[in-house]
Amino acid sequence: MSLIDWFAARRKDQFVGKVSQDTDEGDGLWVKCSECSQVAYRKDLISNFNVCNNCGHHNRINSDERINIIADKNSFKEFDSLLSPTDPLGFKDRRAYADRIKESQAGTGLRDGVVTGICSVNSMPLALAVMDFRFMGGSMGSVVGEKITRIIERATLENFPILIVCASGGARMQEGMLSLMQMAKISGALKKHKEKNLLYMPLLTHPTTGGVTASFAMLGDLILAEPKALIGFAGRRVIEQTLREKLPDNFQTAEYLLEHGFVDVIVKRKDLKDTLTKILKIHGVKELAEANT
């Protein structure tokens, strides 16, 4: 190896060592795309809604970032922010459930895995629930179920459309049957919302699985999804072992579900607000100032 090659290798090692693999972690200047391995300047990635400029991969984002994309500036009013999970079963596997809660709360600044509230989208009202995968994999426990149910009930009372941004590994096993019952509770609240002919849209992001998919994620009047999002109930390996068949490579992706009629539209993150605006207008949602006159 020549001296020039040696210096070039050293520079490459130093450069790569400062690259983060995850947009949610670290404060490095550079981020490597988990899909195509392209290295991007962090500020450029953030300005593009955390979507890779090279391959279009939609990196995972947190609830605050989601709200900023969807809601008009300073329009989001959060509800039920003080609700916090307990440990009704005294559950312990490798670690105590209570310790897992504390760790997730400290790491995310959230009390549980969903943020709910009312906002406006280009001056039109929208009830909004945003699940945050950082909090115990977006799992649905009793607090997540209660907060989503409450925002649906508020939307029903005030005749607002609702959008639920789904990002979840499913029901939270540490709460047992209390977690599973949230599926029925949320579905019941959505039924009353539907009876008033109000619009409900789930946005399926990566990943949307388990009990969330088996309940409110698939009950929308219009089901939206982000590109290449993993959407399903059981895992691919479980299904293949059960059926003893090899599944298609794109199985359980947003594109596969769109092709087979389970998803209505795939929306790129940069187009989400414009798409929501068009849908709300088509469904006759009035701007707040107009609705109050």
Swiss-Prot record:
Its EC number is 2.1.3.15. A zinc finger (C4-type) spans 33-55. GO terms for molecular function: acetyl-CoA carboxylase activity; ATP binding; carboxyl- or carbamoyltransferase activity; zinc ion binding. Its main location: cytoplasm. GO terms for biological process: fatty acid biosynthetic process; malonyl-CoA biosynthetic process. Residues 29-293 form the CoA carboxyltransferase N-terminal domain. InterPro entries: AcCoA_carboxyl_beta, Acetyl_CoA_COase_Trfase_b_su, ClpP/crotonase-like_dom_sf, COA_CT_N, Znf-ACC. One of its GO terms (cellular component) is acetyl-CoA carboxylase complex. The keyword Manganese does not apply. It comes from the Bacteria. Zn(2+) binds at C33, C36, C52, C55. Keywords: ATP-binding, Cytoplasm, Fatty acid biosynthesis, Fatty acid metabolism, Lipid biosynthesis, Lipid metabolism, Metal-binding, Nucleotide-binding, Transferase, Zinc, Zinc-finger. Pathway: Lipid metabolism; malonyl-CoA biosynthesis; malonyl-CoA from acetyl-CoA: step 1/1. It is found in: Cytoplasm. Its cofactor is Zn(2+). It catalyses: N(6)-carboxybiotinyl-L-lysyl-[protein] + acetyl-CoA = N(6)-biotinyl-L-lysyl-[protein] + malonyl-CoA. Pfam families: Carboxyl_trans, Zn_ribbon_ACC. Binds 1 zinc ion per subunit. Component of the acetyl coenzyme A carboxylase (ACC) complex. Biotin carboxylase (BC) catalyzes the carboxylation of biotin on its carrier protein (BCCP) and then the CO(2) group is transferred by the transcarboxylase to acetyl-CoA to form malonyl-CoA. Belongs to the AccD/PCCB family. Acetyl-CoA carboxylase is a heterohexamer composed of biotin carboxyl carrier protein (AccB), biotin carboxylase (AccC) and two subunits each of ACCase subunit alpha (AccA) and ACCase subunit beta (AccD). This is Acetyl-coenzyme A carboxylase carboxyl transferase subunit beta. The lineage of its organism: Bacteria, Bacillati, Cyanobacteriota, Cyanophyceae, Synechococcales. The gene is accD.
